[in-house]
Amino acid sequence: MIDLAVCMALQEAGYGVYGDTLFFGVSPVLDSGSVSSTFGLYVNSQTVDVQGDLYTDGITISSRYDDVLEQGLTMYKLLWWVNNDFRSTCSLSCEPISTLRFDHVRVYPCKGVDFDAIDGQGRWVKSIRFDVSYKLLPIFD
């Protein structure tokens, strides 16, 4: 669910609207290898390390745009945002979708921009990747 929290942070930062141009838990690259026709930013996470109650997830923000210039500028702004403003984040919230929160958050610098797939018209799905460490809060007490 850390991917939903990052998605909500993107919405708060003005990168789009959840469910319209911001998505989590789905990929713009389909199982057939083809590319989704829905444009926007897709946020996904995968656990890369667990040390006691400290979790580290790899976050991927994939971009799918019709306009290559808009995509390039968005990726540039995202790199800056993650490496500057977002890195100072101490907690993340999944609100208003869920009441789940993540405290004691540490955001690591981006690892770069990758090309994940290409559609039938030569447009790329580009992604940035970075790690986020966090502690789980006891929500089921």
Q: What spans do the regions from the language model cover?
A:
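Extracellular/virion structural assembly segments
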Residues: 65-94
